[in-house]
């Protein structure tokens, strides 16, 4: 018999598109599925099994789990600071890729997924290497993961993944762990992949009905270089190569012109917005308001641990709003409800999971987060016409305020502690793996 959990008497923000609030409200889960959402009395009217778990959510916000639409697992946190993007890639990131082993890569994914889950993330799109280990990590931890191997085939990048290895992972992990673990096709960058790789990826995406993920237009240099090499701006070149479409998710998209925005909108291509990374690397502010106005699905991404430097999507929401405001010199943009939508339902739409996750609705999977509002920095909590919890979640709360996380109805975080795996063992192994990685990297650069 399926387990039953009632999250009762919280402040429920379902994020189903209507800005509804049930205050107080409840969420009833049966097995992996949401079976009731609403006011306390309405949900209480549902029959409850004698062995049902009842979680008292008084003074807690109850929201859908967060969707991280662009992540790189890694172990370079706190290194290569205060450097320009392409200098940083060549000096630190690419040498680390050369030194990477499957064992180190798996340790990095276990660290990233555990860190994200602890902070309320239920789904990640991870572009990484040796991703059989990432699949094991996601299955053990319980998080949803879209695995996107770094594919590169141009000269000088032979240490990345290939379309052949990506296809092998797609065939073995197309829909694994009861659908929680999926594989997409990953094209590292326009300057790392040949036109033939783009064409083959588009062909495979259609054949396997799967997604494509890549980076674009993170810096002005990329735009200028694309014009020099191809005579087209990056998104125009993507269109020319045939990869734009409803299956495609493009990270960053900072320096797009009006025509490129039109191309994304017309083709149904989605965007992963990474505000912390774009600020830290001084890449610039993406035109998120224009994207959304054009009907483009825009999700939030943390990017990697080295360019953020954490994987806290609660914090990412605050920076997404503040970056929008200061770049437009307009305090009315970056509305908390819009930002919450980007982190939940819009992120699920951008990654093809909106039928499954992203909002608290009957029939969807029970991906739920509770946030403890009994904090100095979250006081006062106001109700009715003065309701301020949406603003608190975006501007005041952080991942450390997350109390519990359910994925597919399984409670993976309880009282702020990850229960599905031994988080301390994962941290210890990641520390060892990082030391090994830097030793290997040093040996390679000294030869």
What kind of feature is each model-predicted range?
Residues 77-107, 141-156, 220-247, 267-270, ...:
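Active-site gating loops and adjacent loop-to-helix segments of metal-dependent hydrolytic enzymes
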Residues 133-254, 259:
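Metal-coordinating catalytic core of metallo-dependent amide/deamination hydrolases
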Residues 365-420, 427:
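C-terminal cap of metal-dependent C-N hydrolases
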Residues 60-61, 80-143, 165-176, 431-442:
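Alpha-helical scaffold segments that flank or form the walls of functional sites
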Residues 240-247, 289-377:
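His/Asp/Glu-enriched, well-ordered alpha-helical/loop segment
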Residues 1-48, 61-62:
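N-terminal metal-binding scaffold of metallo-dependent hydrolase/deaminase domains
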Residues 13-24, 37, 281-282, 348-389, ...:
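Acidic, glycine-enriched loop/beta-strand segments at the rims
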């Amino acid at each position: 018999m399926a387990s039953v959990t009632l999250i009762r008497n919280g402040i429920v923000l379902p994020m189903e598109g209507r800005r509804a609030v049930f205050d107080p409200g409840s969420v009833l889960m049966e097995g992996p599925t949401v079976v009731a959402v609403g006011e306390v009395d309405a949900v209480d009217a549902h029959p409850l099994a004698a062995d049902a778990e009842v979680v008292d959510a008084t003074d807690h916000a109850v929201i859908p789990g967060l969707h991280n639409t662009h992540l790189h697992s890694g172990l370079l946190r706190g290194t290569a600071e205060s450097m320009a993007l392409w200098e940083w890639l060549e000096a630190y990131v690419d040498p680390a890729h050369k030194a990477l082993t499957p064992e180190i890569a798996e340790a990095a994914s276990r660290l990233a997924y555990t860190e994200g889950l602890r902070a309320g993330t239920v789904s990640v799109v991870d572009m990484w290497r040796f991703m059989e280990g990432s699949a094991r990590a996601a299955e053990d931890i319980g998080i949803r993961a879209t695995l996107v191997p770094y594919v590169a085939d141009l000269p000088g990048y032979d240490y990345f993944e290939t379309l052949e290895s990506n296809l092998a992972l797609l065939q073995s992990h197309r829909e694994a762990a009861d659908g929680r673990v999926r594989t997409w096709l990953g094209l590292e960058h326009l300057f790392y992949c040949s036109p033939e790789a783009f064409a083959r990826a588009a062909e495979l995406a259609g054949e396997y009905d799967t997604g494509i993920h890549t980076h674009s237009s993170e810096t002005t240099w990329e735009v200028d270089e694309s014009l020099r090499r191809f005579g087209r701006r990056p998104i125009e070149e993507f269109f020319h190569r045939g990869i734009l479409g409803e299956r495609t998710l493009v990270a960053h998209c900072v320096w797009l012109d009006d025509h490129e925005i039109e191309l994304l909108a017309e083709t149904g291509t989605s965007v992963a917005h990474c505000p912390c990374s774009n600020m830290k690397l001084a890449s610039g502010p993406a035109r998120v308001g224009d994207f959304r106005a054009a009907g483009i699905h825009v999700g939030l991404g943390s990017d990697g641990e080295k360019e953020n430097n954490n994987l806290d999507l609660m914090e990412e929401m605050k920076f997404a709003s503040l970056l929008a405001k200061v770049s437009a010199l307009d305090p009315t943009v970056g509305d908390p409800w819009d930002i919450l939508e980007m982190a939940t339902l819009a992120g699920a739409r951008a990654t093809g999971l909106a039928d499954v996750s992203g909002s608290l609705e009957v029939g969807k999977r029970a991906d739920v987060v509770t946030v403890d509002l009994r904090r100095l920095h979250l006081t006062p909590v106001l109700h009715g016409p003065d309701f301020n919890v949406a603003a608190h979640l975006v501007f005041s709360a952080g991942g450390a305020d997350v109390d519990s996380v359910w994925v597919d109805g399984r409670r993976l975080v309880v009282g702020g502690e990850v229960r599905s795996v031994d988080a301390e063992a994962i941290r210890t192994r990641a520390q060892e793996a990082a030391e090994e990685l830097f030793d290997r990297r040093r040996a390679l650069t000294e030869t």
